[in-house]
Amino acid sequence: MWITQEITPYLRKEYTIEAKLLDVRSEHNILEIFKSKDFGEIAMLNCQLLFKNFLHIESELLAHMGGCTKKELKEVLIVDGFDLELAHQLFKYDTRIDFVQADEKILDSFISFFPHFHEVKNNKNFTHAKQLLDLDIKKYDLILCLQEPDIHKIDGLKRMLKEDGVFISVAKHPLLEHVSMQNALKNLGDFFPITIPFVAPLRILSNKGYIYASFKTHPLKDLMTPKIEALKSVRYYNEDIHRAAFALPKNLQEVFKDNIKS
């Protein structure tokens, strides 16, 4: 049996699977989990694939991209996603996490897929809310948006950031869909003086790119190496990975020269 991942409208990958382990459907989402010989379990969420053996790559990169460029990480907001492993990584800092996800049925169906599901959900500093309006009014050090936000969402979320806060959002991969990345950079650039694209180096199974945005904090100039060296139980993230994430080939430097703000 095979499952197909759509990388772009014109590019697809196929993966061999052995069996389907789970099929859960809600009003807005479809989650299927498969058993794979090469990749362990594979979750397909609305045609996007998550590989259980490689969950740590994105969660470590995004968590510590924010955590190691900020002196303090006291308040974190995660919206538009299901990745509880991201929260697990963020708990390496002395932080409180607000996690906004309305689809409890799908979130709870990841119970056996996310290795630290119970640990995160039971943490006293973790709050799960169905919508932003359910949360106390506060300012955040770090906001992570796990789907590409439109300008209205950007406008709302940036008002929730502290003056030196960091906003990280998912975008299209800059190499595969550079026009979409350009548009995402332009949208964020209308609200932030610092907007820089990055990817996960050596991650070959993803079609995602990301954008680091901030009013004051710079992902390279403000990187704190001692914080990186103090991290424990990480398998992917280090200083080299952090810096390499922002490297662009010459042709993309030219493509994005009017969109990157640093």
Swiss-Prot record:
Which residue ranges does the record assign to the PABS domain? 1-249
- Which is one GO molecular function term here? spermidine synthase activity
Q: Which residues bind spermidine?
A: D83
The record's Gene Ontology cellular component field reads: cytosol
Instruction: Report the Gene3D superfamilies cross-referenced here.
Output: Spermidine synthase, tetramerisation domain, Vaccinia Virus protein VP39
Localization recorded for this chain is: Cytoplasm
- Out of the domains of life, which is the source? Bacteria
Asked if the record carries the keyword Cytoplasm, the reply is yes
Residues annotated to bind S-methyl-5'-thioadenosine = N29
The catalytic site is made up of D155 (proton acceptor)
Q: In which pathway does it act?
A: Amine and polyamine biosynthesis; spermidine biosynthesis; spermidine from putrescine: step 1/1
User: Pfam family of this protein, just one?
Assistant: Spermine_synt_N
Q: Which reaction does it catalyse?
A: S-adenosyl 3-(methylsulfanyl)propylamine + putrescine = S-methyl-5'-thioadenosine + spermidine + H(+)
Q: Which PROSITE patterns match?
A: PABS_2
What does the record list as GO biological process? spermidine biosynthetic process
EC nos: 2.5.1.16
> Key word Transferase present in the record?
yes
Q: What is its main location?
A: cytoplasm
Q: Which UniProt keywords apply?
A: Cytoplasm, Polyamine biosynthesis, Spermidine biosynthesis, Transferase
Described purpose of this protein according to its UniProt entry: Catalyzes the irreversible transfer of a propylamine group from the amino donor S-adenosylmethioninamine (decarboxy-AdoMet) to putrescine (1,4-diaminobutane) to yield spermidine.
Assembly, in brief, is: Homodimer or homotetramer.
Recorded family membership? Belongs to the spermidine/spermine synthase family.
In Swiss-Prot or TrEMBL terms, this protein is called Polyamine aminopropyltransferase
Species of origin: Helicobacter pylori (strain P12)
